[in-house]
Amino acid sequence: MNIVNTNTRPRPVIELDGTPFYVDAQWLYLIQVGNPDNRIDMQEACSYKDHMELWYDPTIKNVFLGSHREPPPEHIQIYWFHSFNAFDPVGAAALLDELNPEWRSACKTDLPIIAIAGRQFYVDKEDECFCEVNNCWNCISFKDIVRRKKINGLYINLNTHNTAFLHELDDATSLASLPNHIVFAPVANGRKAKKSIEKNLRQNKK
């Protein structure tokens, strides 16, 4: 993911089938780079419990206009995201500033902190997740923790700094090693964090 300067502010850029789009969480659009009239409404994405799906039609470089109740045509590409806000935390914060200027007072900042693949995350026992210290929209569920070679950890996609989806890991099983953008990151390097994580792992086994 790159940061590209625009006339308004720097915004992250993602690619859909090779076409770059700005992620603008303030106005809730994906905006084609170089063609600002072509916009994808983020609310057109299907929201599920653990991810969002965007059905992308490369022939029009926009969201698929057909029914989502049936399997899509072969040319439609389905992209999974954890959160658009996590791509553009500055824009998401700007939107909340307009709606509720006091929103920051509800943010939890007195929690244990651990490092996950080079970034700092709060350990939120109440919500059972890790929440990135510098990006409150980037959260990782305790349920995503796996045990590999007797080590608790997470498969992290470095492009999003969140967990790799199962289909991404399935695609990697045919490779001799994980692709460069996916790493196994050990977790739990603090007593309080370790206790919360291990308790959740025991509950998941029941």
Regions inferred by a protein language model and the residue ranges of each:
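Gram-negative host-targeted secretion-system effectors, predominantly Type III and Type IV
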Residues: 1-206
